[in-house]
Amino acid sequence: MAPDLNSLPRSEAPSSAFNPEQKPNILYIMADQLAAPQLKMYNPDSQIKTPNLDRLAASSVQFDSAYCPSPLCAPSRMSMISGLLPMKIGSYDNASQINSEVPTYAHYLRSKGYHTALAGKMHFVGDQLHGYEQRLTTDIYPGDFGWVVNWDEPDTRLEWYHNASSILQAGVCGRSNQLDYDEEVMYRSTQYLWDHVREGPDKRPFALTVSLTHPHDPYTITKKYWNLYEDVDIELPKVRIAKEKQDSHSKRLLKVCDLWDLDITDEQIKKAKRAYYGSVSYVDDCIGKLLETLEDAGLMDNTIVIFSGDHGDMLGERGLWYKMSYFESSVRVPMLVHYPKWFAPRRVKQNVSTLDLLPTICDLIGTKPAPFLPMDGVSMMPHLLGREGGDTVFAEYTGEGTVRPMMMIRRGAWKYITCPADEPQLFNLDKDPLELDNLARVAKVEPQTEYEREAKAAFEGFEAEAKAKWDFDAITEKVLQSQRSRRLVWDALSKGTFTSWDHNPEDDGRLKYIRSNIPLDDLERRARYPFVDSQGYEISKTVNTTRG
């Protein structure tokens, strides 16, 4: 017999205010490629204008050291929804398919009576729902095996890899693929919220994930947002490292992204960053619109708002662009949890991960992850309540630019990076926030200072921990086998009649607006909010059901 998730141990209510039996709604907003160090809520000197996000942060629990589980879209997202590190679920790159038997936060929410919906990007391959009851849009990226990394030919640049075009062609646009997509995401999301509030009195609480594709490159944005930075002298990267002096992984990234032989001018950097800044301001307006809709629909006081992202963007720092590395601008993400009636606004300094969202959401709704299944994520509930919580983050990466598995451990002030193909790295981010002093150098010499002795002890501890945690040879074989198998399947499926795996959302126009089989006056009254009676007087009773 299948286990009843409602019979799992409940989270203990740690305070009189916290009461998961209330089943508040949940709105989870994601931005794509949004670098936390670039935002004003983390960097007071930031040039990016984000008034809505700043207001939200001021009344939220703000995590100052949040990280993604992998600095690439799909692996990061698959780990985020499952609470499991990428290697445990086979999420090796942007064309990896995770098994449908892996529970996600959407499954736990549905089991507790929530209506789970997704609007926007999630980068699913194969199964396009993974526990969501409803997808309001298709995805912006392919849901198949077309983007498989090839470690068998590490020096070959594949057609779909990042390249310099996003930088060289940066600037103003009237419209773009990204804008087309996010405009649909926003329309569907706000419509969903209005549909919810117009449902009958027995409606379920909602858990809506809104996943925007901005500010992901290409670096283009409309004139409205470009002009926000007309009088701003866009800052140039703080750290510049000659390509010959880069670490080995960064050298591979420059080649993978076709940037090795390119000298990007300061003017080109400023144009790309200005467009990125404008795209972040666009995301900020989207956040404002969602929050405004919650307010107007009377949902704000009963909705937990979570905001985060899948990874960051280097934006020219160290000469690097996009993501795919463990430097701060690539791997650190924003994280906010807003629900003032339970959680007083505060800042959390400890290290957390989007991997921790699943067990945290379980705590928020009064359940626990299944004890008979593995779980890498750690609930952030202690942090939300102002108590001592976790301070360790693990991350795994086997996507573009790698030739062997590349792992990270973040704990306290330390960041440790290891890969069998590269030299190890160790940074103390309290003393070296720009990550310029690789303290792994002390492992081969006699420490001369107390700081070096501390660094050597930390390095040796991390080396032993990594060796115990990861079997790099076994992981390499699994990744290679998966890559080869998926390439074989994709090659076969590309021949003959092509059948798409991409999601096609249902949208039956025959059931919307004015139709002959629906009494006109009744329809108009039920579609209006707030509700009114036949004489136009506002009534509080909900009378409509618009979503199955």
Region annotations inferred by a language model:
Residues 1-419, 424, 433-457, 496-548:
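Formylglycine-dependent sulfatase
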Residues 443-498:
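A contiguous, mid-protein "functional segment" used to position or interact
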